[in-house]
Swiss-Prot record:
This protein's encoding gene: PSF3
InterPro entries: GINS_A, GINS_bundle-like_dom_sf, GINS_Psf3, GINS_Psf3_sf, PSF3_N
Lineage: Eukaryota, Fungi, Dikarya, Ascomycota, Pezizomycotina
GO annotation (BP), single: double-strand break repair via break-induced replication
Major localization listed first in the record, in broad terms: nucleus
Descriptive protein name: DNA replication complex GINS protein PSF3
Length: 179
């Protein structure tokens, strides 16, 4: 669970997720673009994760939840299959800037063993490439800039940490040679 004050957590919770209303709810038609109407049972709308989660967890008098959450398109079966095939070729940032954080939040709500495995394998495979790019002195230029565009925020932090540590190690080695 991330910090309440974390900007990354706020941005992750603002990610839209598909929701299906299980009940007719008076006055919520504006979520669908109907300013004066009700939200009809069976209506599908994309809501921020925080709101969808609250509505899914809240229950009416007959103990039915107001909405059913569906996994977001960033974690659809098509994307998970692409990640299984070759995780290095998928532009995670285009899917969700906070892809892994979104995956972690969705896994808090859904029990998806396969998704856990795919996300874990994806991170491991991409981390090796990130480390390789970070240790290249020209990693942030040219080809490296294209590489950086596809990284989600966690991967960018990993890249910066690896790049800065490699740079610090080179500086340290240079200083040792001078002495």
């Amino acid at each position: 669970m991330s910090s309440y004050y974390s900007v990354d957590a706020i941005l992750t919770d603002a990610q839209k997720v598909p929701c299906t209303f299980e009940l007719t709810v008076p006055g919520l038609g504006f979520l669908e673009g109907n300013m004066s109407g009700d939200m009809k049972q069976g209506s599908k709308v994309e809501l921020p994760l925080w709101l969808g989660e609250m509505l899914a967890l809240s229950q009416s008098l007959n103990t039915s939840s107001l909405v059913t959450l569906d996994p977001p398109s960033a974690l659809s079966p098509r994307v998970l299959n692409a990640l299984k095939a070759d995780p290095r070729t998928v532009d995670l940032r285009a899917l969700a800037p906070h892809f892994y954080d979104l995956g972690a939040r969705i896994l808090e709500l859904f029990e998806e063993e396969k998704m856990i495995e795919v996300l874990s394998d994806t991170f491991k495979a991409r981390a090796a490439v990130i480390a390789d790019q970070a240790h290249n002195p020209r990693g942030a230029l040219g080809e490296g800039a294209d590489f950086m565009r596809g990284l989600d925020e966690n991967e960018r932090q990993l890249f910066r940490a690896a790049h800065d540590s490699a740079k610090a190690a080179r500086t340290w080695m240079t200083d040792l040679k001078r002495k």
